[in-house]
């Protein structure tokens, strides 16, 4: 391929034309005909378990960025992963993902701030995707409903159905295209239509509706009949406000992803899902939950009697085909409570009492505890399998019980705490619990007024990722950096959204022999940040690979020491201010003198 391209005209038009017609070139050009055969052999050389995982990728559209977490949890639900030699199903599936990356069968998509896993997302190269689609169809594994797809005959025992955003068929076409009684997964990428769920789908295990438009509350009632479901994603379905009680019948459910919905309360019946391992929620609405659960019930009666006929006439703002129940849910669970309690945190969910019954939970978040009783927090303490917990709504009434709860979760690896009261510092919570955090904690996120970092944070020898921000108001930049610089395992550091008290002259300095393991540094919207300096007279951040600087209402005056960072690969500078030619010129000069030849990416714009 390289030799062929080297002999082509070096013009943008020619290369663009080749890129658009690469499949045809591979078929017609004798010089390139060997490439597909090589790629096919790379597929055929995969072990059986990786072949299944690779063919599964044909579900996703062209050039689609596929989340590692999404893939891993779907593979688990499909039975592609199992516990092996003491490794959990998630660890095994993660290993499969990395094996496909290492074999270059799938391509990594790197984000500015990676997770503990290193690679968060992947893509399929167009040529590998063609192989995946072809083989998956040959084996009746995956069928894609898309514009131009043939539905003239019923497909035999198709396992996975993907509905593309450009498919405009009707119910008759849908039911004639696939034998619904055999499908194990349904993935919708476009607009939701009610006939996508059928009582014939008796063995459906995976229902992935991430980003689907037109899905409203009353559609969820039909999903409750699919009792073999193990994975449900409603992520970014932002017209969903409430889960029905009937979802308590989904006793096989392992993963429930509600991030980006407007759900604020979980029904009591959720505690029947004793196999649930992953519960994700982070809303996108104003404060929308009641303090004791009584207000929405009373408002529902009022709304049903008086308001619905009028409101339903004005429901054009809701996507899909909302009925009176959807509109009433919106007003009674969102609008009225929001007006009553404007100061509540706009994100997170309220979990029901008896959440302790969900003993299999590994991941729980984002939980809003602003008005949770002590018994609710004690319930969370009994979730002894928890590896990841995210909590918001911390205030002076609940912080002591929260500290006690976290202390009791000995297996916790990731913790996020968001404080919502400006009248009291998160400092009080952390000062009162010097042994608060499990020693094997790997990821910690602290949002709220801190004033200073406690000395005990230096005892977190296993901490790999740390994020501090949202009005943390740390008073001493140097003291903060000295404490953090001593963490031996810290690889990812994010300081964001006013982590320091605004002084107008903030200078962040990375001293010699500090941050021995730091690989990713993200400084985001630190108002008053004037300079970032890496001391050149010694080993400073010797493993740093990625530096991201993001700012809005200010300009950096100086960035220095980049030429001495031995492993630096990439510097990203972005924000909504004009480029400072002097600073950018200095950065380019420093990077040109860095022996590792790091890449500079600049994305500055003005509103």
Predicted regions and their residues:
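Leucine-rich solenoid repeat modules
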Residues: 526-607
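Surface-exposed helical/coil interface segments that assemble multiprotein signaling complexes
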Residues: 4-53, 58-226, 248, 268-272, ...
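Conserved "Asn-ladder"/turn position within leucine-rich repeats
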Residues: 166, 191, 212-214, 237-238, ...
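Beta-propeller domains
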Residues: 435-478
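Tandem repeat protein-protein interaction scaffolds
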Residues: 216, 221, 230-233, 240-246, ...
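Canonical leucine-rich repeat
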Residues: 217-218, 242-243, 266, 289, ...
């Amino acid at each position: 391929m390289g030799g062929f391209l080297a002999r082509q005209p070096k013009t943008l038009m020619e290369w663009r034309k080749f890129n658009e017609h690469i499949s045809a070139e591979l078929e017609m050009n004798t010089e390139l005909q060997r490439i597909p055969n090589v790629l096919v052999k790379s597929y055929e050389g995969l072990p059986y378990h990786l072949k299944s995982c690779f063919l599964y990728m044909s579900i996703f559209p062209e050039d689609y960025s596929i989340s590692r977490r999404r893939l891993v949890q779907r593979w688990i639900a499909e039975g592609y992963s199992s516990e092996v030699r003491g490794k959990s199903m998630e660890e095994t599936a993660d290993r499969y993902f990395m094996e496909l990356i290492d074999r270059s069968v799938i391509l990594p998509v790197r984000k500015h701030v990676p997770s503990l896993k290193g690679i968060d997302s992947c893509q399929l190269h167009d040529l590998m995707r063609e192989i995946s689609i072809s083989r998956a169809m040959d084996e009746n594994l995956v069928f894609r409903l898309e514009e131009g797809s043939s539905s003239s005959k019923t497909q035999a025992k198709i396992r996975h159905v993907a509905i593309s955003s450009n498919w405009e068929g009707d119910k008759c076409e849908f039911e004639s295209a696939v034998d619904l009684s055999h499908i194990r997964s349904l993935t919708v990428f476009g607009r939701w239509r009610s006939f996508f769920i059928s009582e014939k789908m008796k063995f459906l295990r995976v229902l992935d509706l991430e980003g689907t438009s037109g899905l409203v509350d009353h559609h969820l009632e039909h999903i409750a009949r699919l009792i073999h479901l193990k994975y449900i994603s409603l992520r970014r379905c932002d017209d969903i406000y409430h889960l029905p009680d009937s979802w308590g019948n989904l006793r096989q459910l392992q993963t429930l992803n509600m991030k980006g919905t407007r759900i604020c309360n979980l029904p009591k019946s959720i505690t029947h899902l004793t196999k649930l391992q992953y519960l994700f929620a982070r809303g996108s609405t104003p404060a929308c939950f009641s303090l004791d659960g009584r207000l929405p019930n009373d408002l529902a009666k009022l709304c049903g009697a008086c308001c619905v006929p009028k409101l339903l006439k004005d429901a054009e703002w809701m996507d899909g085909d909302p009925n009176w129940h959807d509109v009433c849910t919106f007003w009674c669970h969102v609008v009225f409570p929001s007006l009553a309690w404007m100061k509540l945190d706009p994100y997170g969910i309220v979990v029901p009492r008896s959440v302790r019954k969900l003993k299999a939970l590994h991941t729980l978040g984002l939980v809003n505890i602003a008005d949770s009783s002590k018994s609710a927090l004690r319930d969370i303490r009994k979730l002894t399998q928890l590896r990841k917990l995210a909590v918001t709504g911390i205030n002076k009434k609940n912080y002591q019980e929260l500290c006690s709860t976290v202390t009791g979760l000995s297996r916790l690896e990731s913790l996020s705490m968001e404080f919502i009261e400006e009248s009291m510092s998160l400092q009080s919570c952390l000062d009162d619990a010097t042994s608060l955090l499990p020693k094997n904690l790997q990821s910690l996120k602290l949002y709220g007024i801190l004033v200073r970092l406690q000395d005990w944070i230096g005892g977190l020898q296993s901490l790999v990722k740390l994020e501090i921000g949202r009005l943390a108001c740390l008073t001493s930049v140097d003291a903060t950096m000295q404490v953090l610089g001593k963490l031996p395992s810290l690889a990812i550091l994010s300081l964001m959204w006013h982590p320091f008290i605004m002084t107008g002259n903030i200078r962040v300095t990375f001293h010699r022999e500090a941050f021995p393991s730091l690989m990713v540094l993200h400084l985001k919207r630190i108002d008053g940040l004037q300079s970032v300096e890496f001391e050149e007279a010694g080993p400073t951040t010797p493993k740093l690979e990625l530096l991201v600087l993001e700012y809005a209402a200010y300009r950096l005056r100086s960035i220095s020491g980049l030429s001495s960072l031995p492993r630096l690969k990439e510097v990203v500078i972005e924000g909504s201010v004009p480029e400072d030619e002097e600073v950018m010129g200095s950065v380019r000069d420093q990077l040109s003198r860095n022996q590792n030849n790091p890449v500079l990416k600049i994305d500055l714009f003005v509103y």
